[in-house]
Amino acid sequence: MSFFNISRRFYSQIVKKSVKIKRMSVEDIKKARAAVPFNREQLESVLRGRFFYAPAFDLYGGVSGLYDYGPPGCAFQNNIIDAWRKHFILEEDMLEVDCTMLTPYEVLKTSGHVDKFSDWMCRDLKTGEIFRADHLVEEVLEARLKGDQEARGLVEDANAAAKDDAEKKKRKKKVKQIKAVKLDDDVVKEYEEILAKIDGYSGPELGELMEKYDIGNPVTGETLESPRAFNLMFETAIGPSGQLKGYLRPETAQGQFLNFNKLLEFNNSKTPFASASIGKSFRNEISPRAGLLRVREFLMAEIEHFVDPLDKSHPKFNEIKDIKLSFLPRDVQEAGSTEPIVKTVGEAVASRMVDNETLGYFIARIYQFLMKIGVDESKLRFRQHMANEMAHYAADCWDGELKTSYGWIECVGCADRSAYDLTVHSKKTKEKLVVRQKLDNPIEVTKWEIDLTKKLFGPKFRKDAPKVESHLLNMSQDDLASKAELLKANGKFTIKVDGVDGEVELDDKLVKIEQRTKVEHVREYVPSVIEPSFGIGRIIYSVFEHSFWNRPEDNARSVLSFPPLVAPTKVLLVPLSNHKDLVPVTTEVAKILRKSQIPFKIDDSGVSIGKRYARNDELGTPFGVTIDFESAKDHSVTLRERDSTKQVRGSVENVIKAIRDITYNGASWEEGTKDLTPFIAQAEAEAETD
């Protein structure tokens, strides 16, 4: 009997045993994922064991909020960024820029970040321990609700649950003993309403909650100082003199705004248009926690869509208007509820729950992107910011929030920044950041205008004359109208000018303000900005959780069910053994995969195929290609699908085509493998003829 016949018989015996393994349908997979409860510790063990990421500077004890990505984590992040770039930049014809991370003080002072980019912190005056106020209130009230549940007999041991939760969250502080105390129903309702709105409280309001509900140091019970603002930006000095103060950027947006005129010119002065930027940003978090979810250095992908403030329609809105999403609008939250409303995007915009078509369009596109990269649709909602929760620059904002074992996490923001940024930078630099639209039909426009008697400015205001003049020439129409009334009534008015001490008085000899009607052939306006902003690290971690499950037949066998598009490695190439006759085929298949630019790994270790597949299931590798002794004979290989463990067989060329179609062309497993032969049936037939 020839070597190949012996090998064939040997392989068939292996396959006969493998026939007993259940091949799973899509429904089977869903049931299997639901059958085994999610275990965060097990996920983190897999992620760190397979070096998706690890604490930075671990040998030196690490630094809270800083992480390094290993090879699979780096590849996964790159694949998500590549998908993002194609989904947004290429599809929407956006203009990509890469701006510096170092930002001068004046830029961020003008944008409002120096004064307003803060979280609320409170300090234990005895120990010096610092807490983030909203997190502290949330943690204490949640603990009291758990104690109430134990007192009512709804849970067996609230302390065990709390300790388990603290361990999972890797908190270094101890968990104060939770007392099983039954709360009044009204108090329970109050706590639940507070927790539903926890992101919307100001510092003074958090202080009032801490005082009202006797919230102090959760370990010692000591009273804490009142919450105070802590600016989250990392300060630095630019240059050797140390005179030029700067910051590591807290967002990529400012670089895009400051390059607006160049971008508009590059786009042949056509609007609307969008710029985009992908890069690192930095925030000096008060209490980094929850792994990749709250860190001090993170990757962002941001879009600035510049649009006419009088026309926020979108030409492609009809393409997405029928998409149904879960919305959590402001009024629902104000009522103390967290139950989302399911509506189509078209209905949300028509009812003005979502302000305009462009904002609605990008919310829908965010949804489509998140679905593409592996987010669980049932764990996605769009929550509207409360009025006092919005960033200082935002007119409206919706967060794409993903549910994880840590709760609902803000991963994407979609804000209408109105014309705030361009307006403040234009006012500060005296450089117009506007769109000039040629009008088909000239229009008559009546405006307030101010005339200055400049020859009197120098003697009266001396060195401050340029500042006063600049302030007057940049006054809004409303300001000019009010000053005109004062000038008419009193013959004078006063103003406050940046950089000038006290109030500046001007009379009718120095200025004249009147309405004038002109015919305009060009409309000049500051565009509004719709900004989708993605926290890539938070999205990555959420996809980790949404993709993780254990096989019901063996809970120790973990799987990361990444979509093939974003999986770090697409193919595990598995020679059946280290026999020299399999080397040429393995080399040939590797060469074709490399030429096809399909990321792969060869595992020719001596362990069983099952173990090799299992450890790559933990890496999220969607396909396994097995090279056996039949492959050496007829150049056919077996293709295995990760989640269902289904296997098919065909020529090397057809198998690689199937991998490419499923990974990059959006084909399903059934569509991609329709020309391949189910492996088990073939193997059984072979076994019977031997």
Curated annotation (Swiss-Prot):
Write down the PANTHER family for this protein, in alphabetical order: GLYCINE--TRNA LIGASE, GLYCYL-TRNA SYNTHETASE/DNA POLYMERASE SUBUNIT GAMMA-2
Q: What is this protein called?
A: Glycine--tRNA ligase 1, mitochondrial
- Report keywords, A-Z: Acetylation, Aminoacyl-tRNA synthetase, ATP-binding, Cytoplasm, Ligase, Mitochondrion, Nucleotide-binding, Phosphoprotein, Protein biosynthesis, Transferase, Transit peptide
Q: Which residues bind glycine?
A: E251, E302, E531, P532, S533
Transit peptide, residues from-to: 1-24
Looking at the UniProt record for this protein, which Gene Ontology cellular component terms does it annotate, in alphabetical order? cytoplasm; mitochondrial matrix; mitochondrion
Question: What processes in GO biological process is this protein linked to?
Answer: diadenosine tetraphosphate biosynthetic process; DNA-templated transcription termination; glycyl-tRNA aminoacylation; mitochondrial glycyl-tRNA aminoacylation
- An MF annotation (GO) of this entry: ATP:ATP adenylyltransferase activity
> What EC number(s) does its UniProt record assign?
6.1.1.14, 2.7.7.-
Which residues carry the post-translational modification Phosphoserine, per the record? S226, S476, S528
Any idea which residues bear Phosphothreonine here? T689
The UniProt entry's sequence similarity note says: Belongs to the class-II aminoacyl-tRNA synthetase family.
- Quaternary data: Homodimer.
Q: Which PROSITE patterns match?
A: AA_TRNA_LIGASE_II
Entry function:
Catalyzes the ATP-dependent ligation of glycine to the 3'-end of its cognate tRNA, via the formation of an aminoacyl-adenylate intermediate (Gly-AMP). Also produces diadenosine tetraphosphate (Ap4A), a universal pleiotropic signaling molecule needed for cell regulation pathways, by direct condensation of 2 ATPs. Thereby, may play a special role in Ap4A homeostasis.
